[in-house]
Amino acid sequence: MTDNNWVYVVIEEAGASEKILGQQADGENSAFIPAFLEKEAAKISLGQFSIDRSKKYEVQAIIYEDLKTYAKSSGLMIFFLNQSGVILDKIMP
């Protein structure tokens, strides 16, 4: 994975007030951004997240370097997941 690769994240309330969806790791004291290598995997996994059902969510692509910058400024880790929600990699930006 290079900083110029596209990855996929879930966006909450796309538009002017959008933000990248974060989650709390089960059994751990760490918050993270779920990220995916494939858009379809992110769409399939969306139903597995703790979300506010009154808000709208969509999957969007982001440059990996930009995601790392966002995660670092927000104090979040990045967890790469597969479509079943299995953690493939944990990144501390």
Pin down the residues of each PLM region.
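Conserved NAD+-utilizing ADP-ribose enzyme module
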Residues: 1-93
